[in-house]
Amino acid sequence: QRQMCIRDRYEAGCKVVSSYPGTPSTEITEAVAKYDEVYAEWAPNEKVAMEVALGASIGGARSFCGMKHVGLNVAADPLYTAGYTGVTAGMVIAVADDPGMHSSQNEQDSRHHAIASKTMMIEPSDSGECKEFAKAAFELSEKFDVPVIVRLSTRVSHSQSAVELCEREERENIPYEKNIQKYVMMPGNAIRRHPVVEARMKAIADYAETSPLNKVEMNDTKIGVITSGISYQYAKEALGDKASYLKLGIVNPMPIQIIKDFAAKCEKVYVIEELDDVIETHCKKNGVNVIGKELFSLMGEISQTIVAEKILGEKNEYITFEDNVPVRPPVMCPGCPHRGLFYCLHKLGVMVSGDIGCYTLGATAPLCAMDSTICMGASISGLHGFNKARGAEAEKKSVAVIGDSTFMHSGMTGLVNVAYNSTNSTVIILDNSITGMTGHQQNPTTGKNLKGDPAYAVDLEMLCHSLGIKSVRVVDPYHMAETEAVIKEELAKEEPSVIISRRPCALLKYVKHNPPLKVNKDKCVGCKQCLKIGCPAISIHDGKCVIDHTQCVGCGICKEMCKLGAICD
């Protein structure tokens, strides 16, 4: 689905792509990197990505940026102003919502951003529509002088189907013309642009009444369903020809007359939508009687089973098993460089202000070495606030942890604040040489760009010094005794400090692993000390430690944990 989004951007003559990785949107930009005709990059964060896309549009080239739903929060500043300025060439934004929070810290509904920013939003329901809507998005962006958001969801993003490919349509850049009143958003110009924006949204709403992106399917009229996106697929599978459907492809601004006409033909009308009651509210405020969140939850995903149960009263029968397979919790990979560091933090009993990344798993048992995780970059700012609230004693017993990519995303300003507003905070940057959680994307510290070509690599040590931090130390988290000693030393200092925990991600292809470790059964007493690091390669059988050679990468952390010498090379 995600690759279809970018295939049609390619076919539509898109020239500039700038995104920040975030599940489930990442693969859109990875796919476009294969096309030489399109310039594609990973930006340091979503705000920069959207600004790059807007700049390319002003420069006359069709542009695109992609992100997950919480990334749109980061990009909200340029988005809301772009709603006023409009565009020159078509500008399309893909945002992937995550109902069910499969890989996210919240379940927000991006439709609210489209409403508040007064931009257009369309929502495909399958691969074919992803491709069709992507091309339409550029045309609509240029027709109505507006950024167009394509809303995806986890299930739409993670599905696939056959589609028909077309050739690329090469387009010359639109000639650049200086337009201060349109693009310089000082108050006087913004005041003049606002009526233009309102008139534009009215024109889009009028267009939505007859747009082919909104589709009506009339079957049995006892049940009518108004829906959009993946919810259409659930409804169609559950109800089939027992219901008629109005599938809204344009979800902001929404039409009203087509909704009223559809509802008038049906005895009972249901609104099926995941997350918030956006369509339902639109219907009810315009006098259309619908049934929505009385039946369907504001939380989590909908499914065909839920639709059948709520509307038809049909319950599926399931086979139950006496012995349920235990759920395997997410864990850090064998050889993960973060494991040793988090064990040290757990051992020291410090408060850990956490951040977004693979290392968030440091909060899980048995390490339990993280106290908070809010959003990208919040670890450093949060630690500063924590220490200001609790005073000098807290400074000696608290740290922030943040990944290299996350630090480049939004951690630098927090570190500037620590130096500028003076707390003796200790910040640990987990430098694993990649953006790990979203699938090994390059970032400004890795020395390579999106296409794998050599690029400038930010020197983290020099950067931290330039931001006002005098004490910057580098440790190898595989060496836990040294790492623990450095953490103690930095916590004791009467100044802010940074520790860079540097070791490449164990899953990187170029990383060479050591031979798997072995267990001397005669020395092992079954003390289970080695289990405290939470490595999935280690287990206990018949009272003795066992190492799975198919998983072990020979990192040596468990060997350092075993004081009896039972784990050896």
Predicted regions and their residues:
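Short helix-loop-beta junction
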Residues: 31-37, 236-246, 462-468
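A glycine-rich helix N-cap at a beta->alpha junction
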Residues: 37-44, 85-96, 178, 420-431, ...
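Conserved thiamine diphosphate
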Residues: 98-147, 153, 188, 330, ...
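Thiamine diphosphate
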Residues: 1-3, 7-127, 155, 218-219, 363-500, 510-511, ...
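Short acidic, glycine/serine/threonine-rich loops at helix termini
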Residues: 28-31, 54, 75-79, 101-108, ...
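Flexible, low-complexity linker and terminal segments
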Residues: 1-3, 12, 124-332, 337-338, ...
